[in-house]
């Protein structure tokens, strides 16, 4: 975690100096993507066992 933060700080500063709106937009996009991915993953995991059971019963 510490290593990542150190390597990330310079990149963030550069993106900010280039264009604040652009960095903000990319950040929001990445956040929404990670959220949707985690949600879909949890749903698929909980769904897969149920589907298997239903298929066996049918």
From Swiss-Prot:
GO molecular function: DNA binding
Keyword field: DNA-binding, Late protein, Phosphoprotein, Repeat, Viral nucleoprotein, Virion
Subcellular location: Virion
PTM annotation: Probably phosphorylated in infected cells.
Keyword set includes Ribosomal protein: no
Region (Disordered): 1-58
Coiled-coil region: none
Signal peptide extent: none
Ranges annotated as biased composition (Basic residues): 1-19, 28-58
One GO cellular component term: viral nucleocapsid
Highest taxon, organism lineage: Viruses
Chain's role: Thought to be responsible for DNA condensation during packaging of the nucleocapsids.
Protein name stated in the entry: DNA-binding protein
Species per Swiss-Prot/TrEMBL record: Cryptophlebia leucotreta granulosis virus
Gene of this entry: P7.3
């Amino acid at each position: 975690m510490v290593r990542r933060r150190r390597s990330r700080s310079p990149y963030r500063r550069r993106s900010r100096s280039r264009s604040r709106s652009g960095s903000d937009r990319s950040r929001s996009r990445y956040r929404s993507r990670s959220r949707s991915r985690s949600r879909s993953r949890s749903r698929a995991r909980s769904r897969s066992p149920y589907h298997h059971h239903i298929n066996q019963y049918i």
